[in-house]
Amino acid sequence: MKKLYGNTGGLKANQTRRLEKLYRRRVPPDHVISFELARDISGLSHEIHRQVGLLIDRSGRVSWVIVGDHQKILIPDISSYRVAPGRLRGLRCLHTHLKGEALTRDDLTDLAMLRLDIMGAISADTDGHIPQIYLSHILPGATGKEPYQLLPPLKANALNIGCLDLIRALENELAQARSLHKAAKGKERALLISVTSK
């Protein structure tokens, strides 16, 4: 069984077992997360009073299960997942927020710095109901202040967002922006030292 990452101290044996079983779960690739999986991690999160996060690869496999504290998760070293110019990491992060808040500044910083496909916060109440899921993705060619775009909150019954198509479109835009930048860089340049007239 794969290991849990993060703040696992003090968990009961059955809580640890249920968290470890999350590695067996699959998400339809076009869904950001399945309703059942979102409901289950929300319930576990409220039971242990800690945020729970999942890093899900593009085929829908849970690659990392992360246990945080009441306010945040710490994403472990994911350098084994490739990242190349014009490409995203190949992982999306979905995690719970215990107080129902939207994505935090830390979440958005992780999204941008780690080049994640998508960052999501599952806003769940204590009964396990999921009123909304907040999502964001990197904004290719962003020239403004923020390098990401916040999407409208999703309802739990609308989780098929065409995830793979969205990611492919983002990577195409990133590659185009990179090739334009490369073309501009490759132009011949000259430095004028002096101009004199007779």
Report the location of each language-model feature.
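A broadly tuned preference for mixed-charge, low-complexity surface segments
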Residues: 7, 100-118, 144-156
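Short HxH-centered metal-ligating active-site micro-motif
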Residues: 65-115, 124
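Short, flexible beta-strand-to-coil junctions
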Residues: 56-60, 98, 121-128
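Generic structural hydrophobic/aromatic packing signal, biased to beta-strands
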Residues: 53-55, 62-65, 111, 119-121, ...
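Short, surface-exposed beta-edge/turn micro-motifs
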Residues: 49-53, 89-91, 116-118
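Glycine-rich short-loop/terminal segments
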Residues: 1-85, 153-183, 187-197
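Long, charge-dense
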Residues: 118-166
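Generic preference for hydrophobic/aromatic residues in regular secondary structure cores
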Residues: 73, 116-119, 132-136, 193, ...
